[in-house]
Amino acid sequence: MLCSMPLATATKVQALSVDFRSQAALAEILGVSRSRVTRWLKGAGIDPLNAEKVDLLELVWSNLLRVYEPDAARSWLWGVNPLLGDRRPIDLVRAGRAEELMRAIRAERADSFA
């Protein structure tokens, strides 16, 4: 079931498209088609699963930017991470694994201040 996309989600999609340099890059990160991101930006409904992915990506991204510069944060998302059992953070975003991601980011933050 689709529902109208709240303004906050549309705003997040727009901001993330800018942060990741294109709608195509955001679509790849979220594991959806580029046309779907375009529809969201035009106010089309978003399903709950993808809305959660957008929310999680925004949360992860904003926390990563407290630790890293944007290019390093992008690399962190795509790199294999030992704190995540040698999985890529981006795959956990797609799977909605918020707790594991935030735990890894907190560990990264603690290491950066140690």
Each predicted region: which residue ranges?
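Non-transmembrane "mature" sequence context
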Residues: 1-114
